[in-house]
Amino acid sequence: MSMQSSDRLLPLVSQKFLATLLLLVLPALLSGCEEGAAPDKDEAKPQAWQLHLKEVKLPANYKPAVQESIYVPVYATIYYENKGRTIDLAATVSVRNTDLKNRIILKKVDYYGTDGKLLKNYLTEPVELDPMAAADFVVPRTDVSGGTGANFVVDWVADTDVSAPLAEAVMVSTGSSQSISFVSRGQVIKQP
């Protein structure tokens, strides 16, 4: 093979290699920019995707042994660099029954915006949370109604003395080349 024919062959091989590489790498790069699948309209309803949660009818004269309200800070949007630039976040509020033997009942899980206005009631009826079980409540990234000062208030009760549940929020954004995630922990705000 002469030097001239190898010089002509090299650009042809390089072009084929680059075309193949582009076909393999481009879809991977583009999928990294994907904002995620469209959310299911029922994704925030625990009954639709957390079948272990059972609705409970509490009698009007129900007297719990323990009851608390937990405030959980949530960030639907955060500022970066200045107040004109924001990142929208998906949030999952997880309420975990830490008691090894006894159930707790979640009476209310409410989502409030930065202005303090109620945005959503996540429960239509109280739900039972078995020992060591968890209940998750999702605010999709596309729901920015809560703003930078959003929060949840979780009201729970128990029939007997129990270990207090743990309530946390996990906020995540993966919509660009950089991802961000952080956690905030709930705090008891009311104990009758």
Question: Whereabouts are the PLM-identified features?
Answer:
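Short, solvent-exposed loop/turn segments enriched in Ser/Thr/Gly
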Residues: 86-92
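C-terminal motif of bacterial Sec signal peptides marking the signal peptidase cleavage site
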Residues: 28-32
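Intrinsically disordered, low-complexity Pro/Gly/Ser/Thr-rich segments with frequent PxxP/GP/PP motifs
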Residues: 114-151
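N-terminal secretory signal peptides that target proteins for export/translocation
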Residues: 1-15
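Post-signal peptide N-terminal segment of mature Sec-exported envelope proteins
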Residues: 41-64
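Bacterial signal peptide processing site
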Residues: 34-37
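Asparagine-centered strand-capping/turn motif at beta-strand->loop junctions
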Residues: 95-102
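Terminal connector regions
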Residues: 42-49, 143-192
